[in-house]
């Protein structure tokens, strides 16, 4: 079975080798037919402490690394600075 991959934005990098990634999803409400946005935060392993808040990253499922970490950062794009 292939590993799931999600795309999100880094919201925190305060932990060592860990980033918190916000993943947004959109769906249509089954009764009201309105498009709704929901988000969820995932703790992901960042071995090189490379990513900072605002960066776009892709995370992939992995075996449990700690109590909260079950995802690993695969690749990312750094936020453009002016």
Swiss-Prot record:
InterPro entries on file? NA-bd_OB-fold, Ribosomal_uS17, Ribosomal_uS17_bact/chlr, Ribosomal_uS17_CS
Biological process terms in GO annotation = translation
- Organism, scientific name: Bradyrhizobium sp. (strain ORS 278)
Protein name according to UniProt: Small ribosomal subunit protein uS17
Q: Name one GO molecular function term.
A: rRNA binding
Q: Which family does it belong to?
A: Belongs to the universal ribosomal protein uS17 family.
Q: Sorted alphabetically, which PROSITE patterns does this protein's record hold?
A: RIBOSOMAL_S17
Described by its record, this protein's role is as follows: One of the primary rRNA binding proteins, it binds specifically to the 5'-end of 16S ribosomal RNA.
Q: Give the keywords, sorted.
A: Ribonucleoprotein, Ribosomal protein, RNA-binding, rRNA-binding
């Amino acid at each position: 079975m292939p590993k799931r991959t999600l795309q999100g934005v880094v919201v925190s990098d305060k932990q060592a080798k860990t980033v918190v990634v916000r993943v947004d999803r959109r769906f249509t409400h089954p009764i009201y037919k309105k498009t709704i946005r929901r988000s969820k935060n995932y703790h992901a392993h960042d071995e090189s402490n490379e990513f900072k808040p605002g960066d776009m990253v892709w995370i992939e499922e992995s075996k449990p690394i700690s109590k909260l970490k079950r995802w690993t950062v695969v690749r990312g794009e750094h936020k453009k600075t002016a």
